[in-house]
Amino acid sequence: MILPFEYYFLNDADNSSKSNYNNIQFINENQNNNLRQKPKFYPNNQFLIEQEQDKYENKKIKNYISDQIQLQPKNTPINKMNHFANINNYQDNKFSLESLNQAQQDNLQKEEDLSILSFDSQEELNYLQEGEENNQFLNEGDIFGYQTRYTFFENRNNLLVEDATNKNNNNYNYNYNNNNSSTQRNYDFNYQNTNEMLQKKKKSNFQNKSQSQLNNHKNEEKKPSQQRKEQLMKRFESLSRIYNKELSQTVTNGWLKPSQAKTISQDNNLGSSAAKSSKVFYQQQKPFSAQITNSSLKYAAASNGFQNLDFSYKQKQQLIQQETKNKIKEQQNVESNNRISMKPPKSANLNSYKNISNLKNFKEIILTRPNSKQVKFQQQNSVNSQPSSLVSQPLKIQSIEKNNLNSNLNDQNFYDDFAELGSTETTGFSFQNVFQLAGVPKDFIASPRSPVQELNQKQENRENELDQMLNDHHIYVASSVTNQNQIKNEQTERKPNMFGKTLTTLARPFSKEYSNRKDILKSAQQNVRFNKNLDYLDSQNKVVAKNKKRTIFKINQNNLQGNQKDLQSNQTSSVISQQNSIQQYGDDNYQQNQVLNDDQSPLIKQNSIDLNAAEIIQNDENENTQKENVLQQKKNQSNQIVTSQQQSNNYFKQETTTNTSNFSTTSNRIISLQALRQKNNSTVKNSDNNNQNQTNPQNQNTNLKENNDKQNLKKTKIQSASANQAGQSNNQLQKTFFINSQDEYVRRTLLRMGWKENKLLLNNNFDLKWIYIDSNDDYKFLNDNQFYNHFKNNTELTQKGRLLYNLKNNTQFGVNQELFFPRCYDLGNDQERGEFSNEFNRMNVMNLLKKHIQYIKLRRSQTYQEIKQAYQQKQANKLNAQVKDGIFFAKVTKQKFFSPLMYEDTKRDNRFIFNITVIAEAVEILKKLKRQQEEYIDETRQSRDCQLYIYQTNFKLESMISQYVKINVPFDEEKFVFEKIVGMSKEHWSSPSMKLMKKLYSLYKYFKDADPQFKVSGTKNIWIIKPSANSRGSGIYLVDKLDEAIDSGLKMQARIVQKYIERPLIFQGAKYKKLNNKKFDIRQWVLVTSFKPLKIYFFTSSYLRVCSQSFDLDNIKILSKHLTNFSLNKNSLAKENWDETVVELKDFISYLKEFKNIDYQEDVKPKIKDLVIETIKCAADKIVNRKKSFELYGFDILLDEYAHPWLLEVNLSPACSERSSFLTEMLDAMAYKMFQIVFKQNNLQEDLEINKETAISTAPASCQNPDYDWEEIYNEEQKEYFCEEDNNMQLAFNNDIQLMVIGQKADLKKEKNLDKKYFQYWGAIKIQSKIRSFLAKKKLQRLKNQKFTFAAIKIQQKMRQFLAKKQLNILKKQQQTNINIPIEDFNQVSVIEV
């Protein structure tokens, strides 16, 4: 049972140009369950297959294949499925399903064409199927499609072929994968059974044939002869050697005309079968072959068989060798005197020889190659001479293995191989010779679509491209003598040139113009290299030139102040030194301009900036000295110096003009050798003239004395005035800044203020540095006069974990962070993780209380009013507290034990039902929390650290409360839902009493007043988890379960959890446009210019960030409903609607006044200012102050439904994308006025702005808006106290201490009274404690002494009773015996005894 096509099929061949391997698709096993369904008569415990099973399976396979073929379009190219269909339907082909066995996977290459061929007779087919001796031929024949079975796999869309023919085994193993189970059923059977099955299936495949035809067919089944075997082997070797990828280029879109197929078949002795088969395909509009691959062309696949192929491989090989030998002899006869070695030139591309497989697989091809020695010999004789006729020697190339058929026409190395093979001068190089040697027919080579024509055309295009490159890039030509030496010394080296490639290979070194082009390229490389070296040396020369100039100017000043004799003697040296300095300055400027025009390295630009700055400072220092020297010296001396400078300047101008003119002319064209020589001669003459002028200073002196004194004085005044103007302009342009962030508004503002940007990253030449995030290394390399937009240790405010730590520590200074910062915990700390779990459970109890009170308030308003009035009256009549002498004495009540019956009374409201068990437990927990909170000194502080020990003893009630709170159904239906979840019986549900409801209201009222976050915390118990250091909303998510929050803290330590404000301010109504039913927060800019003393500025305007989706607490997984970060919300909006995520402050103020009747300027803004001040003060001591540093912070503030501000986080370098027009205006105004404040405090305002008019002209138009301004909200001025007398003995440790007086002056009388009262109360407490202990001990001693007396009294009482009874019994006996005793005597005796 064989199922080769049941699991896989091919897609419709839409892309016919692609390979067949890309059209493979895996079939889902569930799509063909009917094919894999096991028949009913399958045996369970047997491994033999009966005839009925084979027929059943084969019918299914044939029907499935035919259905797949019908689904394909008619004009699609022949793919694998078409071949498989032809196997079953084509009568001449004797394949059967059983013959499609697996072929070896190791012998298959990915890019080989797997085509199916027909055979001459059935005997050839049987010859391939039978016997062990033919297995080798089968393995070798896999390249041409002698595979016996195909299976398709999805691994990289490649088709793998496995060999099913085992060399020493005749057994066959088959695997059948059942769809319903993963077990594999292996069916093994003998070879005899397979022969019987083959015969049965052959009958089914040829049902249309008569019985006579089948008998004739069986008689024809004979093994082929030995001669036929040899022909098949030779056919395989010849086709694998000759027909390759180049031949496949002739086929246009897979088509081949019959005439071309006929000529090809005749030239190669392949018979007429190729022409016949191609004619049939061409008429039926079918492709020439299944697919022409990149590795080789399968001509046998195109011709659909090896029919009538009669030729001898040895004869063909001999003909090829004779042709090559004849060509070699002809070349040797013509040029026998010029034999050279086989060694290729060094300039050739040697890497291409490694890939010699590009020359294809022919066994021995004799090629020619020029020798590098003769090239050297000709270059030594004359550079302009071309290489003469070169004699080539044969070069034998070993045959390559058959499997190495991977070659690409698009590969550049392929063309380099042919270009480097070379040729003689007479014949020239051509690809025709190579293809002829390979055995390609001449008619095919001459055709216009042959690869030979394409290769020749590409070679010509490469030559044209080289000529164009030489003309476009302006390569200079050096002298012939230097070129000869360079070629001699550097011929063996391969160096990259200015084009990024090796132009020696592009120049085709064995062409006619090889020598000239090689000289041009070598000279171009050296000229470019020489120019680069000069440019890189400029930076070092400029530093040396600075020092020379300073020394020269000092020498000139000393000479001018000296005597006349000294001036006359040193006149010549001073003039020469000045001329040299001016020449040097001119050369530096000329080189600098050349560097800037060519866009050289940034290092040279940096040095030029430093040079200009040094020159400006030097001119400013020497202005006054030059004026004084000119007035003091004599007229002749001043005339001489001025005229010498003028002459040197004129000379410098002439020299620079000649240099620039030569440079401009040479940049437009390639100058010749004569032009270079003329230029060199002209420069030599100019240098000679220059030396003559320098060596004859007397002639200059005579000309200098002839000038007038007045004209010289006017010229000096004009020069000094122009220098002053240039100095002022240079001073304004000296201010530079460096920016490395996305804040474009900062760049615009500084450029508007006259600053220049320094774009060099590794450069410290700037006056202001603006970056996104700072590092500790930045502060090490900063100078004292450089501005920086950060303070060291600013993470104390901007990191969420550090901000939490600083705010908690700030409570000891009287700041209650619970009023403006939601509860927050660090999940990386074990202690705070435990506090968070307690807080989470506490919030569940609080939410339970809120839920019941809210239900009573909404559904039973009358009952709620009664409870409220009773609570107010109870608080008014409370007389258990008294105040004496300012001391509060409270009545202490005993703790009552928990009992649900204590809240039962006769008054009940039967209209609603509560879970009395859960409510009573919650009330007891709230009472304990209340007592623990009242024990704190600060009553307003929230009791967060209290341990809820009741949860540890009764964990079941804890889970019940948490589950009861999370029920999100109407209150009347909670009973039924809660019973299903918890499983509590109906006995726990009953209507609440008035006493219970009053107790709930009193607890609700207490926690509402004591807890500032009680109103905004909501009833869902949602918490938000944030990474400590991330920004822009990354890594943030919301949770409502304790386990999720704690697990996130254990996995990632740098995380905090913060209480989510469930009741924010939400506007409802279409008139509010962007804010309708959406959450928002406020981004407030704050500027800090100093931390010691602390100076805080508050920007008067701000903007609102709005969520892109409506607010919904039931869906906490969609972050765009809860977070306002633009980086998260922009993905859910189109780019045109990005402005919906931002709202201007003035619109919000009007909405707030209309919706809540709240004034933002009076009610909200002052609270935000206090929030900012307290937040910055908590970390001010830990941030390092710097004089010229400043910091811009972004405070994110959220308003609850009562318009109370809450701090969410503080952002470092707040990012603001300019997605609205008002944002750009506000940013420009904010940045401009921010820099005005920063520069004004550091006395830089005068340098930046000369007058008010220029300041107004440079300011943006938005600065005129009064709403856009900075307001100083906190200024902690530093107060310094000094002694009236000089104190020279100042201590060292007092230098850095900053003391400040806080509070009022001390009153001594009040202090004394307070001390007396304190000692009195303290003494009374001590005395009382001693007396109480004394009295207690005395009482115990008294009890110990009295216990003996009590015991004696008890014993006496018992004894008396016993004696009295005994005496009465005696008297009774005497009366019975008639003994008369007087009563008086009896009484006396009894009394005495007693």
Swiss-Prot record:
Observed effect of gene inactivation: Cells lacking TTLL3A, TTLL3B, TTLL3C, TTLL3D, TTLL3E and TTLL3F display shortened axonemes that are resistant to paclitaxel, indicating that tubulin glycylation changes the lattice properties of axonemal microtubules. Axonemes are however normal at the ultrastructural level.
Primary site of residence: other
UniProt superkingdom: Eukaryota
Molecular function terms from GO: ATP binding; protein-glycine ligase activity; protein-glycine ligase activity, initiating
EC number: 6.3.2.-
Class of this enzyme: ligase
Keywords: ATP-binding, Cell projection, Cilium, Cytoplasm, Cytoskeleton, Ligase, Nucleotide-binding, Repeat
UniProt keyword annotation of Transit peptide present: no
Comp. bias (Polar residues): 627-655
UniProt biased composition (Low complexity): 205-216, 568-582, 682-703
Domain (TTL): residue spans on this chain: 911-1250
Biased composition (Basic and acidic residues): 217-230
Biological process annotations from GO: protein polyglycylation
Localization per Swiss-Prot or TrEMBL: Cell projection, Cilium; Cytoplasm, Cytoskeleton, Cilium axoneme
Stored SUPFAM superfamilies: Glutathione synthetase ATP-binding domain-like
InterPro entries, alphabetized: TTL/TTLL_fam, TTLL_monoglycylase
Residues passing through the membrane, by range: none
Function in brief: Probable glycylase which modifies tubulin, generating side chains of glycine on the gamma-carboxyl groups of specific glutamate residues within the C-terminal tail of tubulin.
The protein's name in its UniProt record: Tubulin glycylase 3E
Organism: Tetrahymena thermophila (strain SB210)
